[in-house]
Amino acid sequence: MFSKEYWLSSAKKSKSVKYLAIIACMIALKIAVGSVRIPVSENLRITVTYIVVALESTIVGPAAGMVSAFVTDNLSFILYPDGAYFPGYTLTAMLGSLIYSLCLYQKKITITRIAIAKTINNYLVNVAIGSLWSSMLYGNAYIVYATKSLVKNTILLPIEIVLSYMTLFTL
């Protein structure tokens, strides 16, 4: 997982026309799917973009996946601006892609691997880091955002794991 070859195999995919086309399609799909969301509160929304991110991370790996996450986040902001631009969210998208890649790239797809990736993403990325960004942007206490995000992510976690598994396993 942390070998030089592991990272190089992912980086090489960004130089292949075939994989560049896949990455471009995934970027377009993430933007389209991400534009459909259910608002929960001022900073919380429900989407199914995580399925596309997991799929892309499984195919292209960490290096290409993080570049794609960077491009997707910035294009999404240009096409669907929602408040002020904040680079922390770009880093969050890249970290989410990295976590999926480390758990799924060049590995057998299992419910356990998906559950680990989704749990880390939900609690570390969405709750811990996302709440920090919301607190910095909107000025309320960190605990206010963390509590709301914790409830939402805990409720959705089993559903997201099952949907991710059904999608990735059938492909």
Question: Model regions: which residues?
Answer:
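Loop-helix junctions at membrane interfaces
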Residues: M1-L171
